[in-house]
Amino acid sequence: MANHSSAKKAARQTVKKTLVNKRRASAIKTFVKKVLHEINQGNKEEANSALVIAQSKIMQGVKKNIIKLNTASRKISKLSKKIKTMN
């Protein structure tokens, strides 16, 4: 347990920031799942619109240091590729 007041404050801040980061990461995963769901359903237009939203959320995650840039680029690339290969 922290003894100094500054260490106690840092511990409190860590708890708050962890919750916010988990919430943001969960939101990113949810939007990616929506895109994958639309791809599996075969709705190309719906998948494209969901991809635009997912790209935005993924890049916001990069900006907030939730995920790394290369990871975000890979996710967006894979989703885009799946949509392009749809009939």
UniProtKB/Swiss-Prot annotation:
Coiled coil: none
Keyword terms: Ribonucleoprotein, Ribosomal protein, RNA-binding, rRNA-binding
Family the entry assigns: Belongs to the bacterial ribosomal protein bS20 family.
Protein species of origin: Rickettsia bellii (strain OSU 85-389)
Signal peptide: none
Annotated GO MF terms: small ribosomal subunit rRNA binding; structural constituent of ribosome
GO-annotated cellular components: small ribosomal subunit
UniProt name for this protein: Small ribosomal subunit protein bS20
Pfam family for this entry, one: Ribosomal_S20p
Gene: rpsT
Known role: Binds directly to 16S ribosomal RNA.
Biological process annotations from GO: translation
